[in-house]
Amino acid sequence: MEIIEIIKEFKKDISTILKDKLDRVILFGSYARGDYDEESDVDVLILVKEMPTLKEKQKIIKIASRYSLKYDILISPIIYKKTIKTSFIDEVENYGVEV
């Protein structure tokens, strides 16, 4: 399965937890650039309208772990509030792949 399809499925699963809090999911890093190898992790930025609770974050990590085992990849989710603006967020928004 293509990485984009895996991340779309991941987004669908986390949206059941985050519901209206979820704004966007962006693939970034080596998989977005296309220069990944078998050691690369899958960097995923989760932009939210409102920060999830600790319990919701734990569920997201659990889902990422499940996907990592199922597809033999390491999904590394990072959660940011969409109103936070940093050079990191700007770079991900400019060069990442929205899923």
From Swiss-Prot:
Pfam families xrefs: NTP_transf_2
Protein's recorded name: Putative protein adenylyltransferase MJ0141
Cofactor binding note of this UniProt entry: Binds 2 Mg(2+) ions.
Record InterPro entries: NT_sf, Polymerase_NTP_transf_dom, Type_VII_TA_antitoxin
GSX(10)DXD motif, short sequence motif: residues: 29-43
GO MF term list: ATP binding; metal ion binding; nucleotidyltransferase activity
Broad class of enzyme this protein falls into: transferase
EC number of this enzyme: 2.7.7.108
PANTHER family on file: NUCLEOTIDYLTRANSFERASE, PROTEIN ADENYLYLTRANSFERASE MNTA-RELATED
Entry's family note: Belongs to the MntA antitoxin family.
Coiled coil regions in record: none
Reactions mediated catalytically: L-tyrosyl-[protein] + ATP = O-(5'-adenylyl)-L-tyrosyl-[protein] + diphosphate; O-(5'-adenylyl)-L-tyrosyl-[protein] + ATP = O-[5'-(adenylyl-(5'->3')-adenylyl)]-L-tyrosyl-[protein] + diphosphate
Sequence positions that bind Mg(2+) 2: 41, 43
Biological function: Putative antitoxin component of a putative type VII toxin-antitoxin (TA) system. Its cognate toxin might be MF0142, which it might AMPylate.
Keywords for this protein: ATP-binding, Magnesium, Metal-binding, Nucleotide-binding, Nucleotidyltransferase, Toxin-antitoxin system, Transferase
Species of the source: Methanocaldococcus jannaschii (strain ATCC 43067 / DSM 2661 / JAL-1 / JCM 10045 / NBRC 100440)
Residues reported in the UniProt entry to bind Mg(2+) 1: 41, 43
Listed cofactors: Mg(2+)
